[in-house]
C-alpha cells in the first residue's frame, strides 16, 4: 500500500478484529479445533488446521469438518460446537493475554474505535474482559452473529463505521485473517494486516499495509 494515500485520507476511526489482533486467543482456539477434529477422525496437522480454520466462521468450519468425518453420530455438529465453545472457554480462562501493545494502543487512542468480529458477542466480551481490554472497548462490539454478516462480507465493517459516525474511507481496519482483510478492502477502508503476505490474495496486497506489531500503528493514528 502506498503510505501517501493513507495520509491523504485521514483516519478518523479504527475497527479492530478481536482474536489474534487485540487478544492472543487465535492460537488456543485453533488448537482446540485441531484437537477435536483429529479426535473425530480427521488427519490433519496443527499447521494445516490453523491455515484451514483461521478467521473462518464456525458454521463453515463445521461444514468442512463434518464432510470429512465418516459415520457421524446423531447431532454431531451441534455437539461438536457445544463442546468446542466449552473447551475453548476453559482454555481461555487458564491462560489468555492481550496481544503485545494492545492495551497501550487502545488506552491511548484519541479517535473512535470498536471491535468487529466473526465470533459470538459472549465469547468476545469474555476474552476482552479476561485481558483487561473490555473497559476500553465498552459496548462497541459488532458481532457477525448479531447482524448475520460474516467476513469476508464487508457489511459488518460498514455497520461499525456508521455506528462510529464515519464514512468508510476515513476508517482503518486492523486484522489478522484473510477473510477480514478481504472484508476491509471491499469496504473501502484503510487496511492494516498482522497477517504476513503469504496466503493473502495477490489482488488485494497493494491495498493492504502489512505490519509486524500493533506498535507499528502508533505513527498512523
Language-model segments: residues:
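Short beta->alpha linker loops
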Residues: 28, 53-57, 97-101, 119, ...
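Helix-loop "lid/cap" segments that line or gate small-molecule binding pockets
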Residues: 34-37, 57-72, 127, 161
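Metal-dependent phosphoesterase signature
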Residues: 39, 65-104
Amino acid at each position: 500500500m502506498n503510505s501517501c494515500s493513507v495520509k491523504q485520507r485521514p483516519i478518523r476511526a479504527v475497527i479492530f478484529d478481536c482474536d489474534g489482533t487485540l487478544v492472543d486467543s487465535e492460537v488456543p482456539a485453533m488448537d482446540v479445533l485441531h484437537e477435536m477434529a483429529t479426535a473425530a477422525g480427521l488427519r490433519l496437522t496443527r499447521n494445516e488446521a490453523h491455515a484451514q480454520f483461521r478467521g473462518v466462521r464456525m458454521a463453515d468450519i463445521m461444514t468442512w469438518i463434518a464432510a470429512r468425518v465418516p459415520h457421524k453420530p446423531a447431532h454431531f455438529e451441534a455437539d461438536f460446537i457445544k463442546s468446542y465453545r466449552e473447551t475453548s472457554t476453559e482454555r481461555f480462562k487458564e491462560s489468555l493475554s492481550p496481544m503485545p501493545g494492545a492495551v497501550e494502543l487502545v488506552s491511548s487512542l484519541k479517535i473512535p474505535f470498536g471491535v468487529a468480529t466473526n465470533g459470538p458477542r459472549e465469547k468476545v466480551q469474555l476474552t476482552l474482559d479476561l485481558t483487561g481490554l473490555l473497559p476500553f472497548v465498552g459496548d462497541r462490539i459488532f458481532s457477525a452473529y448479531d447482524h448475520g454478516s460474516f467476513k469476508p462480507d464487508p457489511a459488518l465493517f460498514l455497520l461499525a463505521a456508521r455506528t462510529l459516525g464515519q464514512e468508510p474511507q476515513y476508517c482503518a481496519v486492523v486484522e489478522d485473517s484473510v477473510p477480514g482483510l478481504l472484508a476491509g478492502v471491499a469496504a473501502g477502508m484503510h487496511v492494516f494486516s498482522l497477517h504476513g503476505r503469504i496466503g493473502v490474495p495477490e489482488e488485494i496486497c497493494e491495498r493492504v499495509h502489512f505490519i509486524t506489531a500493533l506498535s507499528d500503528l502508533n505513527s498512523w493514528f
